[in-house]
A protein has these predicted regions:
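Composition-driven recognition of glycine/serine/threonine/acidic- and proline-rich low-complexity segments
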Residues: 1-250
Length: 250
């Protein structure tokens, strides 16, 4: 029997994991908040060295992920993502998902998070979707994702394409097609689209089509970082400069 996941709390919840003896889960580095003494935590190159390096390149994740195993008997642990925000437990198997940068929190051992070559060149060059690599789920079980702020699930249907600001996308159904552009305008000229993007205040957007769902978050991490920099300043001169501080927390 696989370990079970549940969320505790309504605002910035904990991820509660219950493991029977012999069960294990894996999670992003530093996600563990608390665990009972029957559990054992160790760093592991999940999927081997090559996949670990590819995940590092794709999503700037830690090379070693945490593996928590119930070695001495049943036990519970609490996990939390790095940034403020909500989490969602997703069932994978019949449906697989593509994850944006920093979205992965934890997964059952039946699920593999693999770095694959991105099929969308525009997203590879300009998007927050992992550069030329994207993180995709494989296998069967549950994976937990997080986003900055509250999460909301959007259904995409063949008769209803959806345009989403790139910085608000957490994950999406891998069956969906997506295109990245610099504007929500339907004009075809690249300069007019760039001008519209600048004047409207919108940056990159993703246009999803097909059938599937997209999970979005209410806050944009990059915009928030820019706002903090405007308040605190970006000077990096001297020890403890604000730029270094911001880089450490974001």
């Amino acid at each position: 029997m696989a370990a079970t996941f549940s969320l505790i709390g309504t605002i910035e919840p904990f991820l509660h994991c219950n493991l029977k003896k012999g069960d294990s889960i894996y999670c992003e580095a530093n996600a563990m908040v608390m665990m009972e003494s029957n559990l054992e935590l160790k760093g592991k190159l999940q999927g081997g060295l090559m996949q670990s390096l590819m995940r590092r390149f794709a999503n700037d994740e830690s090379l070693f992920q945490q593996q928590i195993e119930a070695v001495n008997g049943e036990g519970d642990c609490l996990l939390a993502p790095t940034l403020d925000g909500d989490m969602q437990i997703i069932d994978v198997g019949a449906q697989q998902y593509t994850l944006s940068d920093g979205a992965f929190v934890a997964a059952q051992t039946g699920v593999d998070i693999r770095a694959n070559i991105q099929r969308n060149l525009g997203g590879a060059v300009f998007g927050d979707t992992g550069g030329f690599m994207v993180m995709q789920t494989q296998g069967q079980g549950q994976v937990v994702v997080s986003g900055f702020g509250s999460l909301f699930e959007i259904d995409v249907t063949p008769d209803k394409d959806v345009i989403i600001d790139n910085g608000h996308v957490v994950c999406w159904d891998s069956n969906l097609d997506y295109k990245l552009s610099v504007s929500t305008s339907k004009k075809k000229g690249i300069m007019s689209n760039i001008i519209n993007s600048v004047t409207s205040g919108e940056g990159m957007v993703l246009n999803f089509s097909g059938t599937g769902k997209v999970i979005i978050c209410s806050r944009n991490r990059d915009s928030y970082q820019g706002w903090l920099q405007s308040i605190l300043g970006t000077s990096s001169g001297g020890r403890g400069g604000n730029s270094g501080f911001l880089n450490n927390i974001l």
